[in-house]
Design a protein with these regions (language model features):
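Cytosolic, long alpha-helical scaffolding segments
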Residues: 1-214
């Protein structure tokens, strides 16, 4: 009954502008992370860019949460809005954690599977950016939203595979040499895998919203 009633009330569309701004920031963060994973002397520069985009995303998240408290009619349930923007923010937060580890351990070279993961994370960010505008008309876009979330889940699985492959390669490379290099590399892999996990969380939140609205 409440869902039917809400459908006839004017909605605050500013949320979709905020979602778009946040998703664009996440894409920029993922691109900076990808550049960071190329390695070289410019690595700290790209780490700083990741940090800046994470700060920008935090500011937008606060705007969304403030709007949730102040807006009478929201596009969909307030809890769903909070969970969606929080899961998106968690993804770029984890990118920042990756960059922090790189700065802390002064890493300048990255393994090929790490760079492959970086490419997949950019794909994830772009998929989220494609999905969010479709939430303005969920009933018309169920098939596309489902396809996007399924692709996000597949990408998360591919990242898991690359994580395992990369750890095995690190072990074989460093088991008779520098243990610290293995530990540092394993930590970076762990952070990268968590970025993909957070994107999968975004997919789950989108699916939850779709189920609630159709």
């Amino acid at each position: 009954m409440l869902r039917w009633f809400r459908a006839f009330l004017p909605r605050e569309e500013r949320f979709f502008d905020l979602f778009a701004r946040h998703s664009q920031t996440v894409v920029q963060g993922a691109l900076a992370l990808q550049d960071m994973l190329r390695g070289g002397d410019e690595t700290p520069v790209f780490c700083q860019r990741v940090n800046q985009f994470e700060n920008d995303a935090d500011n937008i998240t606060r705007e969304v949460l403030t709007a949730v408290r102040r807006t009478f009619i929201t596009p969909f349930d307030r809890v769903d809005i909070k969970n969606l923007i929080t899961s998106m923010d968690d993804a770029i937060d984890q990118m920042q954690q990756t960059a922090k580890a790189v700065v802390l351990f002064e890493v300048r070279t990255f393994e090929p599977p790490m760079r492959e993961i970086g490419t997949l994370l950019v794909e994830c960010a772009n998929l989220v950016g494609r999905a969010l505008p479709l939430l303005q008309s969920i009933g018309d876009n169920v098939a596309m939203l489902t396809a996007i979330t399924e692709e996000l889940t597949k990408l998360e699985g591919r990242v898991d595979d690359l994580h395992d492959i990369g750890l095995k390669e690190l072990f074989l490379k460093h088991r008779n040499a520098n243990t610290m290099d293995f530990i540092v590399g394993a930590e970076i892999y762990d952070h990268l895998e968590k970025v993909a996990d957070r994107f999968d969380d975004v997919a789950n939140e989108i699916n939850s919203i779709v189920i609630e609205q159709v």
